[in-house]
């Protein structure tokens, strides 16, 4: 790493987990942070210094990072309320040179480092990969939105939403990998970087961009950039009646796939995490899935304490009395991502398993039936129910996230951040997923994808909860009544 820094004439190098489109789940071949550290989680960046490599991860990934990160990597475990970039800045001398890959950082994030001596790199020195593009060039489409002023859009979810186009050729996504120029009824969809770069370099007028989603390389090509926060995210967040109907149909099939895997677990012995994961994908495809919306999490016992357990093992076998957590979802023809988490038990559960499961179920029922205005309020309420509820078990992530073309969309967001201050409106779709985790025992997370209708929360997911894991003595009368609205298997 010292040799690399010297060759680049740097003192520090920031390595992102994203790609040039700034997506959350790039292919691992595009994820320089993975190449550098061995960590496969969806978020968390790395900083190379003269004497260390630092990996920054939030509470979802504390255990996973310890298990996956290379021995030469120092894992910085962010606590609730800590900001990754604030912790990165603490390690940097502002008078020394910090390298940042221009194609893999948003303009807005780059500007938060403006008091530092930045060297913007055109090529990722960790992953100098060849880019691939959609084969066919789409010449015409009818957008759902006409920008009255010249606007350049690079966020893949926004481009897919505006064009109504979907691409299922890549794993875990339905987005089209293109950039979009709109000026009134004029529109140009770019699938080729050379064409796009030439257009931007030669465009003489003002061009509206969102610094939060355009990469620094593209921004530098524009002669007269005008920053304006995108209105499209808010448009996308409120789903139309047609989108809600498409989602209902998608979740009907997701429920069937998960129900099938429940029966598979009940009726077969000696299954590994890997066996269950393969069978789950088969079931999704059987019910019409075009792709998984993310790599399914199938985690037995202690592995289920990792909120985003990365790789289902052939060596971890589900035995009598074991818990298995399954977090999964899929894309169907509408190109909307489904997301659900359930916990099953093989055989007879013990009292601790029942207590933890029931405590998480109580939190779900109370959150689902509450009437708060913002995601922050929901998240605060959930933590008041689960923090310190059971000794040794922690709820170390936000309550939920928006869903749509991407499995993680915002707004809405049910967590402790600025976006979560957005009002949750009718038509917004989101998850409610409380959990409790103990790395020495197991974890339980129960996740339903929901939407708001007429001021009330409605669940897309209809698959029920595990009767043998519920301790009814821990439920009050109101919670028992609420539970009757869901299937108990």
Report the location of each language-model feature.
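Active-site neighborhoods and metal-handling regions in enzymes and metal-associated proteins
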Residues: 1-489
């Amino acid at each position: 790493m010292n040799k690399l820094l010297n060759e680049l004439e740097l003192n520090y190098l920031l390595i992102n987990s994203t790609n040039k489109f700034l997506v959350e789940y790039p292919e691992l071949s595009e994820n320089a942070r993975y190449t550098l550290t061995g960590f496969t989680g969806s978020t968390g960046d790395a900083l190379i210094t003269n004497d260390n490599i630092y990996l920054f991860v939030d509470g979802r990934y504390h255990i996973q990072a310890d298990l996956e990160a290379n021995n030469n990597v120092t894992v910085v475990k962010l606590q609730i309320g800590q900001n990754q970039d604030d912790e990165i800045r603490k390690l940097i001398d502002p008078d020394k040179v910090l390298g940042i890959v221009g194609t893999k950082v948003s303009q807005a994030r780059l500007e938060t480092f403006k008091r530092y001596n930045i060297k913007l790199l055109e090529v990722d020195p960790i992953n100098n990969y060849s880019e691939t593009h959609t084969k066919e060039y789409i010449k015409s489409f009818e957008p759902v939105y006409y920008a009255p002023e010249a606007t350049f859009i690079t966020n893949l979810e926004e481009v897919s939403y505006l064009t109504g186009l979907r691409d299922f050729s890549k794993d875990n996504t339905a987005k089209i990998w293109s950039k979009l120029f709109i000026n009134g009824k004029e529109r140009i969809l770019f699938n080729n970087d050379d064409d796009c770069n030439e257009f931007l370099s030669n465009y003489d007028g003002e061009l509206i961009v969102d610094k939060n989603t355009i990469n620094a390389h593209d921004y530098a090509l524009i002669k007269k950039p005008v920053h304006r926060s995108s209105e499209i995210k808010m448009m996308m967040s409120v789903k139309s009646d047609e989108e809600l109907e498409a989602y209902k149909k998608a979740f009907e099939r997701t429920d069937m796939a998960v129900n099938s895997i429940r029966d598979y677990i009940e009726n077969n012995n000696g299954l590994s995490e890997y066996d269950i994961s393969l069978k789950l994908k088969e079931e999704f495809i059987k019910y019409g899935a075009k792709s998984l919306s993310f790599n399914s999490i199938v985690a037995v016992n202690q592995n289920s304490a990792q909120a985003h357990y990365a790789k289902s093992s052939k060596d971890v076998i589900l035995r009598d009395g074991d818990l298995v957590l399954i977090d999964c979802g899929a894309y169907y023809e509408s190109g909307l991502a489904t997301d659900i988490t359930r916990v099953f038990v093989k055989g007879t559960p013990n009292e601790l398993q029942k207590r933890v499961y029931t405590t998480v179920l109580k939190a779900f029922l109370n959150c689902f039936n509450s009437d708060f205005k913002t995601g922050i309020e929901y998240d605060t309420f959930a933590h008041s129910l689960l923090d310190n509820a059971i000794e040794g078990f922690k709820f170390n992530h936000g309550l939920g996230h928006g869903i749509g073309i991407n499995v993680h969309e915002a707004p809405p967001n049910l967590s402790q951040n600025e976006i979560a201050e957005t009002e949750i409106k009718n038509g917004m779709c989101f998850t409610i997923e409380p959990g409790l985790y103990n790395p020495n025992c197991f974890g339980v997370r129960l996740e339903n994808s929901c939407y708001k209708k007429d001021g009330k929360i409605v669940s897309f997911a209809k698959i029920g909860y595990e009767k043998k894991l519920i301790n009814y003595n821990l439920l009050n009368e109101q919670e028992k009544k609420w539970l009757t609205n869901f299937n108990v298997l």
